Amino acid sequence: MFCVLLLTGKAAAGWYQVENYEGSIGPNPVHLSLQRYDSFGSGITVEGSYFHDAKQSPIAVYGKISGTSVFLCEIADDREFDRVLVMGSKTPVGTIGCPFSLDLGESGATGTWSKGSDKFPITLKKVASLDDTGEAKVDGTVEIPFWAQTATHRFAGVYEKAGFLVCMNKLRVIDKKKKKVVQEIAFDDDDCDAGMLMTPIYMNVQKQVGRSFEIISVNFRGGSAGYSRDYVFSHRFKDYRLLVN
């Protein structure tokens, strides 16, 4: 599988370098989160997640960084998500024709989003960052917009520093229509392993949806290959509850 797992050793440095931005694409307020990594595969050196504040539906992005220049493509559907971000391409991916073109600065980014005849300016302010590739560093409130979502909810992980480590302290469940947090799931996690398993940080929460159930899986670093905890949505209580086997 293309999405390799993180090293589980406590002393080993990780590979999460994440920067979060707030701003606008044209007249529309947006949030953007980007993770840099040289070895995503297929020539990809940056992956991320962004959403329009009005819609609250995260869109996966991927692309390349060259100096301060960033070029990002959007994932259109589940099939492309699996092909590009899960399995990986046998040949290097290209970014020609992709909508995002950004120039990164110390405090933010500017650029354009263009698709067909539509073209909008982008203005972004850096609001938070996370880096565990060396000594763990967290600046600001780092909230990761995970790729997984349902028709009703999106999910955001709040990452904090705990001693020499960084991990997800809690998971926020956001109602898309109400645009507000409707539940917070805290983790009894003395080892600081929550949300630290998958190479793309945005894949540390995954979903399973059937006709009568919605389950989210939270990934944890630990052991030889990591593990996950499943939370099932209760239609009676209108929240996610830990699924106990």
Model segments located where?
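Exposed acidic/polar residues on beta-strands and adjacent loops within beta-sheet cores, strongest
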Residues: 14-245
